[in-house]
Amino acid sequence: MHPGGAIGGELIFSRLGDIVTRWPWVVIGCWTLLALMLPMTVPSLTELTQRHPVVILPVDAPSSVAAKKISQAFHEVDSENVLIVLLTDDKGLGPADETVYRTLVDRLRNDTKDVVVLQDFLSTPPLHELLVSKDGKAWILPIVLAGELGTSASYQAYAGVAGIVKQTLESTAGSSLKANLTGPASTVADLTDAGARDRTSIELVIAVLLLTILMIIYRNPITMLLPLITIGASLMTAQAVVSGVSVLAGLAVSNQMIVLLSAMIAGAGTDYAVFLISRYHDYIRMGSGSAQDAGCAVRQALISLGKVIAASAATVGITFLGMSFTKIRVFSTVGPALAIGIAVAFLAAVTLMPALLVLAGTRGWVAPRRDRAGAFWRRTGVRIVRRPVAYLSASMVILIVLALCASLVRFNYDDRKQIPASDESSVGYAALESHFPVGQAIPEYLLIQSPHDLRTPRALADMAELAQRVSQIPGIALVRGVTRPTGKPLEETSATYQAGMVGKQLGSASHLIGESTGDLNRLASGAGLLADKLGDVRIQVGQAVAGISGLLDNLAFAQKMFGDSKTLGEIDTAGKLVSSMRALGNMFGINFSTTMNDINWVGAVVIALDSSVLCDTNPICADARAQFHKLLTASEDGTLDNIAHLWKQLGSTQSSQTIGATVSGLEKTLTAVNTSLRSLGLDNPNVMRSKMIGLQNGVNDLASAGRRIADGVAVLVDQTRTMGTSLARASAFLMEMGQDASQPSMAGFNVPPQLLNTEDFKKLVQAFISPDGHSVRYFIQTDLNPFSSAAMDQVNTILNVATGAQPNTTLSDASIYLSGYTVTLRDTRDYYDRDLQLIVIVTMIVVLLILMALLRSIVAPIYLVGSVIVSYLSALGLCVLVFQVLLRQQLHWSVPGLAFVVLVAVGADYNMLLASRLRDESSHGLRASVIRTVRSTGGVITAAGLIFAASMFGLLLSSIATVVQAGFVLGSGILLDTFIVRTITVPAVAALLRRASWWPARPWGNNA
């Protein structure tokens, strides 16, 4: 030992060696009690895998937050424990199949213990298009199961639903319907079964491999069994401690973690045991102890290697503990468990293993065999020292070529590929993809949350624009929602569709006007004729009023002067009066009869004008229609008939009539007229005169109005014809716009307010809008593989496009969320990238600092850590060649991070053993120290490497792809580190650097 040895560490292990060698049975008894009694006080790890399952992402992950928001807004269960029942009929789904479907839905709804939510298209018709395949041969029945995903409650619920599905299909006749179970719940159930099924076989194979390798190395059954006893006690104790931590602190447990814990304890524990046995044999050979005094050799070996084993365990354990600060729960839960396992393995290596060596050594059961490999390793050391550049170059070429292959790595985030293709969930996924696009079965959910009610036309229009923009992203197949329930915008809500409908209506109006051209011409002609006749009436009434006024004056005077008994003929001066009365009556009787006949057709005109919307909007036409109504009223109430009778009486006046009789007859007629036209004042001569004047004025106004009517009707007809032409042009334009601008990018969006109250809209609301109206979700289906990196990149694009559509809209203050399995994978990738950086930094710092503390040097730890990194990259490159290039399997995303921690930590073990021995042998000269170190550690490191690699290769028997890949990369990495890096590369570098390796400390001895 050199003077600069770790005095404190040696003192600790010296005292520990004294205790172990003095009371070995006590130490063994304590470990036996721990290994047997401790597991009885805590649940098994298998049980805890269901009580405390591993959740990959933290609760504040964006995808987790989005899922929580959706479940709260729509009052749904926030659970990833989803089972998909796929019902298929290769002959096509028929009525008999639908009967089975209804029966199954009813039975599942009655199973309230296992089923939390059931989504069927019977109770939710808007989901029909999502749940039925386009080929008409498959139905999807999504079910949310009771319990959290991965728990025993979830597993029991899965088994219960699977039983109902199987029983329903078997008990229903007349249907060829088949069922497959898939989805996250089915995948986790298969993983659980596979983990439980694989664990026993893996542990058995590891034990057999260890026995075989130990038998080859030691050729002694007792020596071979000692490490296995130590590993067994360590494993039982470590599992119990991890279980206790899980119960007390809620540490999540998975089957993969249990397998890795077993492998790590087996590998590390065996390494520590091999290191200790090897050094024990060295001291036995050097005569430091005999078979009768094995305790001394054990104590010396423990003092010599205790600090190395402690540094190695600290390196691995602290590195694993550093993983607890990662975000991904796979790392943050596996790390502490593996750290506990390493700590227990270390304690067993420095207490139980020495105690067993003391008992076996004193009986001569573990005496060293003749060192047959020593000469080989010495020759290897000599060659390396003589030609360090050549050996270093050759080893680096191999390592660098393999490391370059690591740049080709492509990660797989599809957990479906972890399990065998023959498992239930894998078969179900394959059947699902044959009938449905993968994106339809695994959609994404875009959530819009606003402080305002989104059930308004403007908000719906803004959301339609947002959804339209998202749908135009390359790789997006469909976007379904309240504004586009079929994946395309509703035709009725597009502005161009509505314009087209208006165009059709205008076209109909134009056509109607065109067909009514003859009626319009007759209307114009009739209005002109009416105006002409009313002009004639005005002239005649003017003459009549003048004549009647004079006549009334003369008759009144004659009656006064001659009395009522005189005849008109007896009055000579009245001759002219009689002639005038006859002429006046005849003239007006004939002309008024003609006018009456001409007025008869006005009724038809009025009926036509009353039904005309255009006349309602035209003031001229409306005024003319009112005048026509007055004429019809006068005709219908007898006013015009009484006037005609007046003319007839005047025309039949005889000279033999007495004045009284004549006046009396005229008065009777006028009284009748007065009854109808009391407003004319014909009930007395004075008023009659004024009324006749008023009549004359009224007729004048009527004639003038008639002319205005005729002129107005002519203008109206011309305007109507012009309007018909304009309507035709407008109709053609709008209909052309409705056809040519029907694409979503040109169609616009308009929601009539009355649409919001329709039954169809209310059904859409239930599926896409939250009850309070403040949250709206859209279903997004992608053309990409939802498990691919391209789909994960698309998630960011969707969010960027959606948020980019918010400014200057009613959604400006809304929050946008995206949920779904692809979003979860995106978060997993993002967290993994950050966690991997953390793991690399923490691991490098921990390994470097511990090596510096152990070797009291800066240079040697730097190239030792560099060699570990190269070894890791080479192992990863070899894994890429085997799985990705040869087997066409992408590496699971969790493998590189876990492999880095294990390989760097294990490589540090061998580095510490090698470097510490170099340091110890430096008193013999640097060149000689390299040769002596290679000779003394070559066999030990090789044996330890083979044992650890065998433990890792035992994982290849797993049916879980991730475990297989991890086992291969770890096993191959350890072999590369054992046979190339520790055997050739590091000794060659040490030989080249010589004294500089220990800078700034000074080596002991000469530079021989």
Swiss-Prot record:
Localization, UniProt: Cell membrane
Hydrolase listed as a keyword: no
Ranges that cross the membrane: 23-43, 202-222, 225-245, 257-277, 301-321, 340-360, 389-409, 835-855, 862-882, 895-915, 940-960, 961-981
One CC-aspect GO term: plasma membrane
Recorded topology in the membrane: Multi-pass membrane protein
Family designation: Belongs to the resistance-nodulation-cell division (RND) (TC 2.A.6) family. MmpL subfamily.
The name this protein goes by in its record: Probable transport protein MmpL10
Organism: Mycobacterium leprae (strain TN)
Gene for this chain: mmpL10
